[in-house]
Amino acid sequence: MLEKAINPKGLVPAVEYKGKALYESLILCEFFEDAFPDNKPNLLPSDPVQRAVARMWLDHLTKTFIPAFHRLLQAQEAEKQHAALQELYESLRKLAGSIQGPYFFGESFSLVDVAIAPWIARDFVLEENRGYKRGDVSSGWKKYAEIVEVRDSVVRTQSVSSFFSVCQEFVALLIICR
């Protein structure tokens, strides 16, 4: 397994560059920005203050939003689901309040948008199973999520809904076979 040779966790994405193993999605995105600055469009703003702002929001997503998403998905008791849903909403409202529209930094699709896009593509799972509604975050969040999910670069890279539909068919088949 080549992934294991590059990433000790055996996860992808993983890249070997000049004999060094590099992995973790957001770290790789920043690496490509640094290693190939002439490739356009850039995912991080050129202004160092705005770059720092982007990194602060990436930290927010990693430390606040993503754990809340997982807690909501994994919660079994109604009380824990409700608490996790409120935590998720709070995290997204904080992010939504800084969106400059149509993308996070305005007209340019950025690394912040890249980082949240897979979770937007997966939020239908929370909607179908945990009562999540984009509009309950805010109208601005709903509009932003709708713009991000139909962006061509996002649509071309996602297989989430097709993966989950196959899983749902498999579960239905298992139930029938019982």
Where do the model's predicted regions map?
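GST-like domain detector, emphasizing the conserved glutathione-binding G-site
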Residues: M1-F104, R178
